Amino acid sequence: MPSRVLITSALPYANGPLHFGHIAGAYLPADVYARFRRLLGDDVLYICGSDEYGIAITLNAERAGLGYQEYVNMYHKIHKDTFDKLKISLDFFSRTTNPFHKALVEDFYTQLKSKGLIENQTSLQLYSEEENRFLADRYVEGTCPRCGFDGARGDECQKCGADYEATDLIHPRSKLSGSELVLKETEHAYFHLERMVEPLLDFIDKSYLPEHVRKFIVDYIKNLRPRAITRDLSWGIPVPDFPNKVFYVWFDAPIGYISGTMDWAASVNNPEAWKDFWLEESTEYVQFIGKDNIPFHAAIFPAMELGQSIPYKKMDALISSEFYLLEGAQFSKSEGNYIDMDAFLDTYSLDKLRYVLAATAPETSDSEFTFLDFKTRCNSELVGKFGNFINRVLAFAEKNGFKELVYSETLLEDKDKKFLDDAQRIVQEAREHYSKYSLRKACSAIMELAALGNIYVNDQAPWKLLKEGLAHRVEAVLFCACYCQKLLALISYPILPGTAWEIWNMLSPKSLDLVNQDKDRVKNLWNSEFFDVSDEVFSLKTPQLLCAIVD
């Protein structure tokens, strides 16, 4: 029976272009997993959207001389275009200015307040006497209280990933004027996170998290304290009973997963469809995020869900990446350590980029993109192993007139059957890797299967068999090689969708109805009918070069 699967990626801030680090961290892994679950035949909904409130946006919009809505509209389109170019197979890309979001945020707030989990408190906050206003989050910078980095933001350190209040910074100053800030009393609404420690620990104990994430978040939850969920800004969702205050972006943003699903349901003219994913406990919910978003997704948002009465689906698995670097340093457009996505894709194929990002994904530790590694992986793995196996077999078949290959039990020898069994074993291993969210191991399985195919072809040497007049034996070897290629395309599809589709198109297997499949959302192939070798027929087409060498 198919499972219902809800997949979300962290909502990207609508305040700048996406870089390779973002893609390798939260978006390519989610896309790969969504494609894998569709192949299994599951009912998948992959949701994301722009995060359009918060101080980072007001700060950059003011610097750009643009209105806030104009600014987020611009980056919403840029992000959507980027995801389209990268073939991130989102079912819907929403935004936190969608028509459902405001009312939903207000409902969360009202429910949490009615249960005594939100209360107004007076506290000391950072104030700029020069600018005559309170400043917080990214309007503030200073020295990180954890690692000592000077230039840390007011809500998190971009160097070590620490999460804190702006008042925790050492020597805080205004991001705009550079002036020293003072502490001044003001009133804000506070979420009593410390009252949610036990429910959160119980929830985390039942959820799937990578061990490095689990260790961090358990310690984090044990030290929770009340947290302000309001800000003194003009851009944001107004707090219903608190004049001149808006909600803190990390209170409203995660609710965007739910409102974004409502937005999707409206777009498909089935306004109640969102409930199948958010109000059904049987739904499997997997979140993909970056390292710096762990506290908000593993503690604050679950606390918001647990603290109110509507049984919204809580995440079953939280997949968090570490940092992805460029040549050993953080991606930074202002510092020149940056790759223009459009220019890169004008030079190199999309699947080459997807493969290298997957093979070097920062799954359990920081990793990096380097041009030397990109070139090496493309040429030695995609061209030397993968592409070579496909092209040599299909080119030989066409040159020697083998247009249709049909399974014949009598023509298969023990070594052929062992080869097919070994191929099936690797496919099963790939399934396990995808199921456990490991792109790196999936890439290894892809190359292992390609290498197995090359070894088989080398050992059987169909060119020699042909010279010896053993055409029936050549046909058996080519059939087995093509069957392996069909499986190779299957396990490659989540990472290399364009390449996999080309392979299937050249093989034209009887077991795959290409006409009735959407090549961007191939569904229900990972099943016994597709694997059944006894009924398979290949109607080969003229081969096309799959992978070109990177100079």
From Swiss-Prot:
InterPro entries the UniProt entry points to: Anticodon_Met (IPR041872), Met-tRNA_ligase_1 (IPR023458), Met-tRNA_synth (IPR014758), Methionyl/Leucyl_tRNA_Synth (IPR015413), MetRS_core (IPR033911), MetRS_Zn (IPR029038), Rossmann-like_a/b/a_fold (IPR014729), tRNAsynth_Ia_anticodon-bd (IPR009080)
GO MF annotation, one: metal ion binding
Pfam families, A to Z: Anticodon_3 (PF19303), tRNA-synt_1g (PF09334)
Cofactor(s) this protein cannot do without: Zn(2+)
Cofactor binding note of this UniProt entry: Binds 1 zinc ion per subunit.
Recorded superkingdom: Bacteria
Protein name, entry field: Methionine--tRNA ligase
Organism this protein belongs to: Chlamydia felis (strain Fe/C-56)
